[in-house]
Amino acid sequence: MNVNQVAENLALSHQEELVDLPKNYPLSENEDEGDSDGERKHQKLLEAIISLDGKNRRKLAERSEASLKVSEFSVSSEGSGEKLGLADLLEPVKTSSSLATVKKQLNRVKSKKVVELPLNKEKIEQIHREVAFSKTSQVLSKWDPIILKNQQAEQLVFPLGKEQPAIAPIEHALSGWKARTPLEQEIFNLLHKNKQPVTDPLLTPMEKASLQAMSLEEAKMHRAELQRARALQSYYEAKARKEKKIKSKKYHKVVKKGKAKKALKEFEQLQKVNPTVALEEMEKIENARMMERMSLKHQNSGKWAKSKAIMAKYDLEARQAMQEQLAKNKELTQKLQVASESEEEEGGTEVEELLVPHVANEVQMNVDGPNPWMFRSCTSDTKEAATQEDPEQVPELAAHEVSASEAEERPVAEEEILLREFEERQSLRKRSELNQDAEPASSQETKDSSSQEVLSELRALSQKLKEKHQSRKQKASSEGTVPQVQREEPAPEEAEPLLLQRSERVQTLEELEELGKEDCFQNKELPRPVLEGQQSERTPNNRPDAPKEKKEKEQLINLQNFLTTQSPSVRSLAVPTIIEELEDEEERDQRQMIKEAFAGDDVIRDFLKEKREAVEASKPKDVDLTLPGWGEWGGVGLKPSAKKRRQFLIKAPEGPPRKDKNLPNVIISEKRNIHAAAHQVQVLPYPFTHHRQFERTIQTPIGSTWNTQRAFQKLTTPKVVTKPGHIIKPIKAEDVGYQSSSRSDLPVIQRNPKRITTRHNKEEKL
């Protein structure tokens, strides 16, 4: 039997059991509810019976016909031929009053415009920057007049704000002062009679507390400092925890070395401040050293050392680490030597020698050292002793020493040349004195008379020069009065250096008299250039192997080798024939000092060398386009032929002639100097309105030599003056008269970025 039929029969039997009631029978609410519950139960029963079949039946979709009228049940608009709108859907809603809230929401949505697309991140950041720039420029623009005023001020004295004087109570002011004069005592008596507050405090404790209490700004600053201190403390604690977790041995090794260096510096500082505490620290360090020495960790016997030894051949850092460990092992295993009593007695004499530093011995032993003037006295004493023993062989020995030193060291020091000149002059004077005793008295008388004539003539010439006020470099001939001195003519090769030597000048009358006595002897009173000629003549006979270049080695500056124009050479004796005006001792000392300082400076040669280098650098360079293996065989050791080089060589065109071509003593650089351009003014400075004003100011001297004392002080007044002992605080808005904004503009921008972007978009649309 089918299940459906069973269900229908059950339903019919259930209906038969129901009692038929009349139509007008009144039903209560409970009865209505019971009927609805019965229907619901009946429906559930039918569904349960249907499900007993065991097969899932598919529910067929109900078909509905499209209606031409648009309502909440049908939204088709095919029949009307128009698009479906929101108003069509809202027509049935208008009639019903129960959907008031829905109507309001729909009206609100209808009134709103289409939502714009959100801007990308780059555009938002750009808008933020623009707004922040405009706000910041607006805030900073209020400082422009103050900056302009400070720039225009002739002088700024910091601190700008005047310090307020400290308000002291009257009892503090009168604590160290008493009435001494009768008038003061009378005034104080009157005040005491009237009970005026002379010594009583004017302020109550509450008023004092209010004055001493910090302001709101100070409290905020104090709180900010405490917050910063707490943040730093937490930061360092986190850093310490992080470092504690690091397992790298290399990191801990580096940290350990850094701590050791820091401890060493602190120990040195502590040793200067508190020696007793430093001694205790020294004992702790010694105990740590003993413990480290007992552990013997630095013998290159561990796993780490063995692995580093394998890589030391290829890795430089590993090799360096091995060397450091070996050095540490050597330092730790080193025994501390303690001297015994016998050794102390024996070494007592050596202590005194060790007190003198080795640097002093090096200075005395090293003749070619940095300061040869320190051993000048020692060398001069030894030379004088040698001249006393054998005065006849002095010139030959001196020449031999000069030649030997030149052969060993070509670049002779300036100080050595001055020392040799001084020693040779001393030897010449002593030799002349010895030979003067051996000559007959007759020759002495004749030579004394001739020397007196020379002196008288020289005095007359000096008197004439004083009267006529002639120039110092005027020449006067004294051929008839000067005694004829017999001397050998030097060889042609030696003539040129002799002529280039400068004649020595006579400074005082006492020196003239001494020279008059010495000039009477033949081959003795000649200065150094003549003696050098005689020595150069003797040295080739004695030593034929000596080269001729040594004759011209003593010459410091040879003008003939450098100057482009040849100057006429004049043969002149070394005996002074001209007397210049008497000079002061200060000028003489100054000239002697300059002479000693620039004795060995070959400035002309250096200058001409520098000029040649500048000319070569300014010449245009030829371009060589030769390639190896192009048209010829190429390879290692093969060079292109000269023909190929000439073929592929592009010669540079000759540049314009240099401005200093015909000026031997001038170098004119025609290229732009980058270093000088950095110091040149590109834009006219602020106070000036025309370039001529600036040039006139630069050209005007500001020294006290060309200006009065008052003008000099005004010109050299410093632009900024600071008072010593005063704290220069930054300028505030309250000091100038502005009100400082409590809230910054930038946080406002960061708090409301959407508001700024929408406003910016509206401005762009407008």
From Swiss-Prot:
Encoded by an autosomal retrotransposed copy of the X-linked gene UTP14A. Evolution of autosomal retrogenes from X-linked progenitors compensates for X-chromosome silencing during male meiosis. One of its GO terms (biological process) is meiotic cell cycle. Residues 407-434, 502-527, 545-555 have a biased composition (Basic and acidic residues). Keywords: Coiled coil, Developmental protein, Differentiation, Isopeptide bond, Meiosis, Nucleus, Phosphoprotein, Ribosome biogenesis, Spermatogenesis, Ubl conjugation. Belongs to the UTP14 family. The modification Phosphothreonine is found at residue 204. Expressed in testis. The modification Phosphoserine is found at residues 28, 51, 76, 80, 403, 405, 443, 451, 567. There is a cross-link at residues 121, 447, 517, 732 (Glycyl lysine isopeptide (Lys-Gly) (interchain with G-Cter in SUMO2)). This is U3 small nucleolar RNA-associated protein 14 homolog C. It comes from Homo sapiens. One of its GO terms (cellular component) is cytosol. Residues 216-245, 316-346, 452-470 form a coiled coil. Residues 533-542 have a biased composition (Polar residues). Residues 396-405 have a biased composition (Low complexity). It is found in: Nucleus, Nucleolus. The keyword Amino-acid biosynthesis does not apply. Essential for spermatogenesis. May be required specifically for ribosome biogenesis and hence protein synthesis during male meiosis. InterPro entries: SSU_processome_Utp14. Residues 466-475 have a biased composition (Basic residues). It comes from the Eukaryota. The keyword Ubl conjugation applies.
